[in-house]
Design a protein with these regions (language model features):
Chain B
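A glycine-rich helix N-cap at a beta->alpha junction
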Residues: 59-88
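Short, glycine-rich nucleotide/cofactor-binding loops
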Residues: 11-24
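Short internal beta-strands
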Residues: 39-45, 84-88
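Anion (oxyanion) recognition and catalysis
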Residues: 34-35, 78, 117-118
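A short aromatic-anchored loop/beta-hairpin motif
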Residues: 76-77, 85, 98-100, 106-114, ...
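Histidine-anchored nucleotide/phosphate-binding helix
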Residues: 23-38, 42
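N-terminal beta-loop-helix "entrance" segment that forms/cooperates
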Residues: 48-62
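Polar low-complexity intrinsically disordered regions
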Residues: 6-10, 121
């Protein structure tokens, strides 16, 4: 993985795009699709994930709509897509092993792949690189979010 | 999960601070339904009403030492778009006035709950 920022022990890879307020990341793939997942900060806030339900391939979602739901012992909520588009693949492994979201949020714990429909415009509202790390730093300080613990 | 968007769920909670272990799950289910894009309302009545008195829900901790209280969940529910409503008649039972309620709760009468039950796709009661 390329350069990784650290915010209170949470990893923020600088090559990804982030919707910091929704705790999601986006990776632009070579074929024009994007991979979407939840951040290290999000998995830490949720705690060990007990169930993850992901929407189905073929569904079109507007930015901000849920692409799935995540439940832990103390939290249940939506994963909101940071970009509009059609879901072209879902991570089937999450059904059997939802704690992939905790162990490898930027890798094996990806949630969906989408064909974005408004990327050029929507990417402007996402943060990447040092700017993303800075914005996350401000958020965890403002909301006093606890330091990351990594489940192995 | 695709057909659930916009479905209406009505959760009726009749348990309150005197039975803490019966207070969490109904709120948790409501938050889950909201996360699944459903239109969700919790109706607090009978003993359920007393958890809405300012300062009460903070005293009920999900698991000792967890730091997660019933108030945490009620706040999460409001953030998730769950509507909280309370039975006007039951407030009188607990000597509660509108200003005693936590923020974000709507006071409704008995006829409203009958309408809401008929309009809902599903009613869950606890």
């Amino acid at each position: 993985m390329s350069d990784v920022g650290i915010v209170r022990g949470c990893k923020i890879p600088k090559d990804l795009y982030y919707s910091v307020d929704d705790h999601t990341w986006v990776r632009l793939n070579d074929d024009g699709t994007v991979t979407v997942g939840m951040t290290d900060v999000a998995q830490n806030l949720a705690g060990p994930v007990l169930h993850a339900k992901v929407k189905k391939v073929g569904l079109t979602r507007a930015k901000g709509k849920p692409i799935g739901t995540v439940e832990s012992a103390k939290w249940v909520g939506p994963i909101k897509t940071p970009v509009s588009g059609e879901i072209v693949a879902v991570n089937e492994k999450l059904a059997d092993d939802p704690q992939l979201l905790n162990r490898d949020p930027y890798g094996e714990g990806w949630v969906v792949k989408m064909k974005p429909t408004n990327w050029d415009e929507e990417v402007q509202e996402l943060q990447t690189g040092e700017e993303a790390v800075q914005k996350y730093q401000e958020k965890v300080e403002r909301e006093d979010i606890k330091a990351c613990e990594h489940v192995e | 999960m695709e057909d659930l968007e916009g479905k209406k769920i009505l959760v009726i909670q009749t348990h309150g601070v005197d039975t803490p272990t019966r207070t969490y799950s109904p709120v948790y289910y409501a938050i889950a339904a909201a996360a699944m894009e459903m239109d969700v309302m919790i109706w607090f009545t009978m003993n359920g009403t007393n958890q809405l008195r300012k300062g009460e829900a903070e005293k009920i901790e999900l698991k000792p030492g967890s730091g997660v209280t019933l108030k945490t969940l009620l706040d999460q529910a409001l953030d998730a778009g769950v509507k909280l409503s309370v039975c006007q008649q039951s407030m009188d039972l607990w000597d509660m006035k509108p200003e005693d309620l936590i923020d974000g709760v709507k006071i409704l009468g008995a006829t409203s709950i009958i309408d809401l039950a008929l309009e809902a796709d599903h009613v869950m009661y606890f």
